């Protein structure tokens, strides 16, 4: 068993998850994603699906934020840090009905989530995101991506990711286009301190 396989279970613990991401340069990555792609506005209603321990919360403007994650340890950490600041966190899996009952959002985030989902599950996520958005709202996804001419190191690291469904740009777009007509894709290879290709999709309802 290689190093990456050995650390996968450890990353389910919030403290190690955050340490690992800090080492990779997650702070700079978060700022870039928020300022250049998510672009939240003060007063926005934001749904963060697979929010983890709430790492994006400190970078957001004053907003109505709801984070959902199935990992209870992540949610406990997020509530302890940010629950007193008017941010809500729910420990649950996400379904169309559960999100439908929450009302409309200006922004739906799914950061590092699609590559953990099979195609049918990913389609359900896009469908859920589309239906959770108000008219003109946006769903932003961020995931590792295979591209032609990719460095062998980047391709290898993606192949060893905890998520077993890293896709090509075309495959991600095919899933998103079943629910969204307007999609703005962006490829970045400069967001982390390791060789890594990231695909950002901005999907507009």
Question: Regions from the language model: what does each represent?
Answer:
Residues 1-45, 49-101, 117-124, 128, ...:
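Class I (Rossmann-like) S-adenosyl-L-methionine-dependent methyltransferase catalytic domain
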Residues 109:
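A conserved beta-strand element that flanks and buttresses the S-adenosyl-L-methionine
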């Amino acid at each position: 068993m290689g190093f990456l396989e050995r650390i996968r279970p450890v990353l389910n613990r919030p403290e190690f998850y955050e340490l690992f991401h800090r080492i990779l340069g997650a702070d700079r990555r978060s700022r870039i994603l928020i300022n250049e792609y998510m672009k939240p506005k003060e007063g926005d209603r934001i749904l963060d699906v697979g929010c983890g321990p709430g790492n994006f919360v400190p970078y957001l403007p004053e907003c109505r934020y709801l984070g959902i994650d199935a990992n209870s340890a992540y949610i406990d950490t997020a509530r302890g840090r940010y629950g007193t600041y008017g941010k809500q966190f729910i420990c649950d899996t996400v379904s169309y009905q559960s999100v439908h009952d929450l009302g409309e959002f200006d922004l739906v985030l799914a950061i590092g989530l699609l590559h953990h989902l099979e195609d049918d599950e990913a389609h359900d996520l896009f469908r859920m995101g589309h239906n959770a958005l108000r008219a003109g709202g946006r769903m932003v996804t961020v995931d590792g991506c295979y591209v032609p001419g990719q460095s062998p190191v980047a391709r290898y690291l993606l192949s060893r990711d905890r998520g077993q469904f890293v896709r090509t740009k075309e495959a991600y777009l095919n899933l998103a286009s079943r629910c969204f007509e307007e999609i703005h894709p962006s490829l970045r290879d400069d967001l982390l301190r390791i060789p890594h290709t990231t695909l950002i999709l901005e999907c507009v309802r």
